[in-house]
Amino acid sequence: MIVNALSKAIMAETLCDELKLNKPVAKEMVENFFEELRHALENGQHVKLSGFGNFTLRDKPQRPGRNPKTGEEIPVEARRVVTFKPGLKLKTKIEKIGK
């Protein structure tokens, strides 16, 4: 179980409180934000959020793998993955929290 996780519902509620929006509008804003991120990544674009970080696409080549139960060698197919690299501001704030 994840404790203290930020959900889309919590984000929408924060928008309601901070910007005095009604709940359906806030939920739609949050959904639209994530839909834009998904759309950009699906179209091969990188997503750069200033002060937060970058989402980039990386192509991973096929590689040999192993079935942990049988030890049988099986190929792991080539695939595209999304990676996230935190921006300097976010990194700095997270490092300060850890101290």
Swiss-Prot record:
InterPro entries: Hist_DNA-bd (IPR000119), Histone-like_DNA-bd_CS (IPR020816), IHF-like_DNA-bd_dom_sf (IPR010992), IHF_alpha (IPR005684). GO terms for molecular function: DNA binding; structural constituent of chromatin. Pfam families: Bac_DNA_binding. SMART domains: BHL (SM00411). Residues 52-73 are annotated as: Disordered. GO terms for biological process: DNA recombination; positive regulation of metabolic process; regulation of DNA-templated transcription; regulation of translation. Keywords: DNA recombination, DNA-binding, Transcription, Transcription regulation, Translation regulation. The keyword Cell inner membrane does not apply. GO terms for cellular component: cytosol. This protein is one of the two subunits of integration host factor, a specific DNA-binding protein that functions in genetic recombination as well as in transcriptional and translational control. Belongs to the bacterial histone-like protein family. Heterodimer of an alpha and a beta chain. HAMAP family: IHF_alpha. This is Integration host factor subunit alpha. It comes from Legionella pneumophila subsp. pneumophila (strain Philadelphia 1 / ATCC 33152 / DSM 7513). The lineage of its organism: Bacteria, Pseudomonadati, Pseudomonadota, Gammaproteobacteria, Legionellales.
